[in-house]
Regions:
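Short coil-to-beta microelement around the adenine-binding A-loop and adjacent beta1/P-loop entry
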Residues: 16-17, 71
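The feature captures the beta-strand-to-loop junction immediately N-terminal to the Walker
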Residues: 32-37
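Conserved ABC transporter NBD signature motif
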Residues: 51, 55-68, 72-73
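ABC-family P-loop ATPase nucleotide-binding domains
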Residues: 81-138
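Catalytic Walker B motif of ABC-type/P-loop ATPase nucleotide-binding domains
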Residues: 150-154, 159
Length: 162
């Protein structure tokens, strides 16, 4: 079974197509990037996958229609928006504690292993971080959740090129 299947996925904004009968299939375990210019429909496709926007056509995420099974899918899907925000007062350790307390599939050990490869430390507050460091924290938190589908909108925005 494919993780995500779209058939003739369409969405218009003010009569202008953002997605025009797009079809694709993504198999489990695959990493897929959507590449295109601004306004090409990348974020609209991600919002459709998450059940955050109405669309025409067929879309199946883990065998479910995100329009009707959004709540159920959120147990299996993790998402970082391109404008994901953390409270400026929160410390790295507090963010980890929070996610550990609310998500049953979160692995503190995985998160700490990801963060060990960065310059972030447990007592550091978000207000002391660069944009790229905040992205690193978000990625560590989300990647440490045992999700079947990760949806990352502009996940490298603000990261340093290595």
């Amino acid at each position: 079974m494919s993780a995500i299947v779209a058939r003739n996925l369409s969405k218009k904004y003010g009569g202008k197509p953002a997605l025009d009968e797009v079809s694709f299939s993504i198999e489990p375990g695959r990493i897929v990037g959507l590449i295109g210019p601004n306004g090409a429909g990348k974020t609209t496709a991600l919002k459709a996958i998450l059940g955050l926007t109405a669309f025409e056509g067929e879309l199946s995420v883990l065998g479910q229609d995100p329009r009707v099974a959004r709540d159920k899918l959120m147990n299996e899907v993790c998402f970082i928006a391109d404008v994901a925000i953390l409270p400026r007062w929160i410390r790295v350790s507090q963010a980890i504690d929070f996610v550990e307390g609310v998500h049953p599939r979160f692995s503190r050990a995985k998160c700490e292993a990801f963060l060990a490869r960065t310059k972030l430390h447990a007592k550091q507050r978000v207000r002391e971080m660069s944009k790229g460091m905040i992205v690193q924290l978000h990625l560590a938190l989300v990647m440490a959740i045992d999700a079947k589908v990760l949806v990352l909108d502009e996940p490298t925005l603000g990261l340093d090129i290595l």
